[in-house]
Every structure is written in C-alpha cells, then in structure tokens.
Amino acid sequence: MILLIDGRSGSGKTTFSAKLHSILGWPVIHLEDVYPGWSGLQKASAAVAETILNPALPADERGYRRWDWYASEFAEWVPTPPDSSLIVEGCGAVTEANLAAARAIGDGNAWGVWVELDTQTRYARAMARDDHFEEHWDMWAEQESQHMAKHNPQQLVDWTINVPEQLTWKL
C-alpha cells in the first residue's frame, strides 16, 4: 500500500506521516528532501511519478537525488524503499500521474490524503519550524496555489483530514 499525503505548508503533513510511521512502521519519503530549492515544488511533484514511483523503472532504480538545503545543490541518490508499503508526503505529492504510478507499483493499493488547515495556523507552524521560511512564504504559497489549480489534489484524494497541534491516537 502506498499513501500520498498532500497539503499546504504547515498543515500537518509531516506530523501525520510521522504518526503513521510510528504506528505502521512504513518508510516515509518527504518531498522536502526532493524539492530543488525554494522554487522547486513542481519539479519535486513530477519526480514522484518520474523517478520515485515510476513503474517502468526496475525497483532498484527508483529513487531521487536528495536536495542539500545548506549547499543549495543536489546530494546523494536515495533509493525508494523496496517495501510494499510506503508513505510519500509533501506539497505536490498528489497528482493524477503520481496516484497512477503509486497504484501501478502498489498493486492497485494507493490512497491520497489531503491535509487541510486554516492559513493563520499553518503560517504560525511554518514560522516556528523554520527561521528562513518567512522570506519565502509568499513565493511558496504561490507554487502551492499553482499546484492546486493545475492538479486539483483536494478532489483526487480519498480522504481529507485536519491535523491538530497535538495528534493522539489510541488504536
């Protein structure tokens, strides 16, 4: 099974995927490691179907080049975990092509999740997380809006959730 988790910055995608990882043990690919810099949302989104989950590639050739945010350049190759279950999270994760690739390598078992949260709370979370984000907030929000307009991920997903500040599950 493959889960693609999408949503705007600060909505709780990473928190949600971390909780799923702690419960299920599934590996997580964070698109934050794939974005080639602050203007790279669309490129990272395309990489999901092109290299990370591409069913036309042999399993051992799937993966991505990690972006080194400090050096502002690509770093090492990171192979896609060979496990049958996987989480890909980040803005840009859900597109028709990405869902199709996930379904192809996940034997049809792929699901999309949209994480929704109000702008004020998202902004506060993002600023608390990264001191350098404020200067990029507007540019990044524009890329998110372009992704949403082009791919309409909110309509493609199977579930829409709201991740509160404290996420507590009892299973």
Predicted features and spans:
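Conserved nucleotide-sensing/catalytic segment adjacent to the nucleotide-binding pocket
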Residues: 27, 33-88
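P-loop (Walker A) phosphate-binding loop of NTP-binding proteins
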Residues: 8
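Hydrophobic anchor at the beta1->P-loop junction of P-loop NTPases
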Residues: 5
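ATP-dependent NMP and nucleoside kinases share a basic, alpha-helical "lid"
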Residues: 52, 76-129
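Post-Walker A helix-loop "phosphate-sensing" segment adjacent to the P-loop in P-loop NTPases
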Residues: 21-29
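Small-molecule kinase domains that catalyze NTP-dependent phosphoryl transfer to phosphate-bearing small molecules
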Residues: 101, 131-171
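Conserved lysine of the Walker
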Residues: 13
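Hydrophobic positions on the alpha1 helix immediately C-terminal to the Walker A/P-loop
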Residues: 16
